[in-house]
Amino acid sequence: MKYELVSTDGRARRGRLIFERGVVETPAFMPVGTYGTVKGMTPEEVAQTGAQILLGNTFHLWLRPGQEIMKLHGDLHDFMQWPGPILTDSGGFQVFSLGAMRKIKEEGVYFRNPINGSPVFLSPEKSMEIQYDLGSDIVMIFDECTPYPADWDYAKRSMEMSLRWAKRSRQRFDELGNQNALFGIIQGSVYEDLRDVSLKGLVEIGFDGYAVGGLAVGEPKEDMHRILEHVCPMIPQDKPRYLMGVGKPEDLVEGVRRGIDMFDCVMPTRNARNGHLFVTGGVVKIRNAQYKEDTTALDPECDCYTCRNYSRAYLHHLDRCNEILGARLNTIHNLRYYQRLMAALRQAIEEGKLERFAADFYGRRGRTVPPLGAADAAS
């Protein structure tokens, strides 16, 4: 993988990730394909929304169908018939989500398989081996996603263990002869000094890109913005920056304004299945009665298949009847909305008009633009 920085506007960056499997224009949003599928979508449909890279879930694909089934097909690209690049998370966040079902030790994490209750062990080395078999174009190191809230002492211990696991991940990745990209994950909760130590340690190890982890786990938005404003300028300029598990459309805009290149989140697909649809002016909750006789397009400014062909009333009808087609049409739209948003952000950066774009984006929602930190505003 190669990263090219094309242009900047303040802290925001317009670039591209170049893989053997294709080019990803950044800032980019990655739809989440947890089990080797973006729920309800064929790979062709996902590509038609404008997505150039997907996220797969190491933890879930390891438990089901497993490495051996994957290898029978070749790798995850062959298994799910997605020809473009794939990033896989390491399993750290899923282990974090298990709560009391897991025990974190220096050697790795012991937990019960959520499918059948059998004992399972996942380590940095095992995560690298699984992702190698998946053929991931971007491999994530195995880390502990520090919970929120966490006091400074706990966050320090967690961050230091993640650094040790980062070294082990790097070593096993290299031993396997993996020629794809390996990203480090910056931890440290909401504490700037711990984030500094984490980033310094990761840069010393050396990675192809750097993710900001441990955010969007319950902390106030102000803390997320503060950490991004602090960390992003210190990440090597020639490496991509990835904000994990984020997020809402507003979060994408704010992440881009602060220098983030890559995002992922289940929100567009999960919300679509629940009738929560993103449109130019905000959100449409399509199951609400006000849309029963609404013959207009879901979003007149959207060019997706759903908006070009169906009315709000029809989508309301499908939702009320729990028809599978409703979930699919909603998903097509939400994914396209996110990709259109990213394309607009890229264009705004190229034209040096990102702050004007942000003002329009929030103005359509009846809101004001959140302030940047002093350093970001000055840049």
Swiss-Prot record:
Names of the cofactor(s): Zn(2+)
GO CC terms: cytosol
Active-site residues from the entry: D89 (proton acceptor), D264 (nucleophile)
UniProt pathway: tRNA modification; tRNA-queuosine biosynthesis
Pfam families documented for this protein: TGT
BP GO annotations: queuosine biosynthetic process; tRNA wobble guanine modification; tRNA-guanine transglycosylation
Swiss-Prot/TrEMBL keywords: Glycosyltransferase, Metal-binding, Queuosine biosynthesis, Transferase, tRNA processing, Zinc
Catalytic activity as recorded in UniProt: 7-aminomethyl-7-carbaguanine + guanosine(34) in tRNA = 7-aminomethyl-7-carbaguanosine(34) in tRNA + guanine
Taxonomy, superkingdom: Bacteria
Gene3D superfamilies, A to Z: Queuine tRNA-ribosyltransferase-like
UniProt EC number: 2.4.2.29
Record text on cofactor binding: Binds 1 zinc ion per subunit.
UniProt-annotated binding residues for Zn(2+): C302, C304, C307, H333
GO terms for MF: metal ion binding; tRNA-guanosine(34) queuine transglycosylase activity
Residues the record lists as binding substrate: D89, S90, G91, G92, F93, D143, Q187, G214
Keyword Acyltransferase: no
Region (RNA binding): 245-251, 269-273
Family per similarity comment: Belongs to the queuine tRNA-ribosyltransferase family.
Purpose of the protein: Catalyzes the base-exchange of a guanine (G) residue with the queuine precursor 7-aminomethyl-7-deazaguanine (PreQ1) at position 34 (anticodon wobble position) in tRNAs with GU(N) anticodons (tRNA-Asp, -Asn, -His and -Tyr). Catalysis occurs through a double-displacement mechanism. The nucleophile active site attacks the C1' of nucleotide 34 to detach the guanine base from the RNA, forming a covalent enzyme-RNA intermediate. The proton acceptor active site deprotonates the incoming PreQ1, allowing a nucleophilic attack on the C1' of the ribose to form the product.
Quaternary structure note: Homodimer. Within each dimer, one monomer is responsible for RNA recognition and catalysis, while the other monomer binds to the replacement base PreQ1.
Full protein name: Queuine tRNA-ribosyltransferase
Organism the protein comes from: Edwardsiella ictaluri (strain 93-146)
Gene name as annotated: tgt
